Swiss-Prot record:
Organism per entry: Human immunodeficiency virus type 1 group M subtype B (isolate BRU/LAI) (HIV-1)
Result for mutant: residue 147 to A: Complete loss of binding to HCK SH3 domain and altered viral growth. No effect on Nef-induced CD4 down-modulation
Localization: Host cell membrane; Virion; Secreted; Host Golgi apparatus membrane
Oligomeric and partner information: Monomer; cytosolic form. Homodimer; membrane bound form. Interacts with Nef associated p21-activated kinase (PAK2); this interaction activates PAK2. Associates with the Nef-MHC-I-AP1 complex; this complex is required for MHC-I internalization. Interacts (via C-terminus) with host PI3-kinase. Interacts with host PACS1; this interaction seems to be weak. Interacts with host PACS2. Interacts with host LCK and MAPK3; these interactions inhibit the kinase activity of the latter. Interacts with host ATP6V1H; this interaction may play a role in CD4 endocytosis.
Modified residues (Phosphoserine): 6
Keywords in alphabetical order: AIDS, Apoptosis, Early protein, Host cell membrane, Host Golgi apparatus, Host membrane, Host-virus interaction, Inhibition of host adaptive immune response by virus, Inhibition of host autophagy by virus, Inhibition of host MHC class I molecule presentation by virus, Inhibition of host MHC class II molecule presentation by virus, Lipoprotein, Membrane, Myristate, Phosphoprotein, Secreted, SH3-binding, Viral immunoevasion, Virion, Virulence
The protein's name in its UniProt record: Protein Nef
Extent of motif Dileucine internalization motif: 164-165
Amino acid sequence: MGGKWSKSSVVGWPTVRERMRRAEPAADGVGAASRDLEKHGAITSSNTAATNAACAWLEAQEEEEVGFPVTPQVPLRPMTYKAAVDLSHFLKEKGGLEGLIHSQRRQDILDLWIYHTQGYFPDWQNYTPGPGVRYPLTFGWCYKLVPVEPDKVEEANKGENTSLLHPVSLHGMDDPEREVLEWRFDSRLAFHHVARELHPEYFKNC
């Protein structure tokens, strides 16, 4: 008895059911919108551009010319522990992030690229406050931000070919502590959630 919905062989349902069964939890340290995605499979009305900084930032990117479509080409999902570890190792293997001077603009470009190609909502790449080493809040992300030695900053700014807009020339203007930071890979961060130990207050709602 029953119509088309009584059959488990409805086109694609077994695949969807299996995907739901295997859905990984969001990694510790992701933002509120990613928690929504984990819990409800979508971003709810409690996280809008008016109430959530990551949602507002993403909406603003849609109005800017960023070089690639902002709408993801894959389903929207929260960053998971496994995905953060895999992404860290992928970027280490491909090169380009290790030792790169951090700026908010560069982080935005990385977040948008990952959002566009992988569908991970861009509220996962957050770090502990400074001064000193900034550890990732998202467990599994193996890149920390490390202050660059002042003499290396000075050395990088010598000569006439220095770009005044290069992040190293901005002398930490992006950073509340005025430190020049660089991304540094640390495989131990896949096993040791340093941010949670240093700042348990950030994880009360996790």
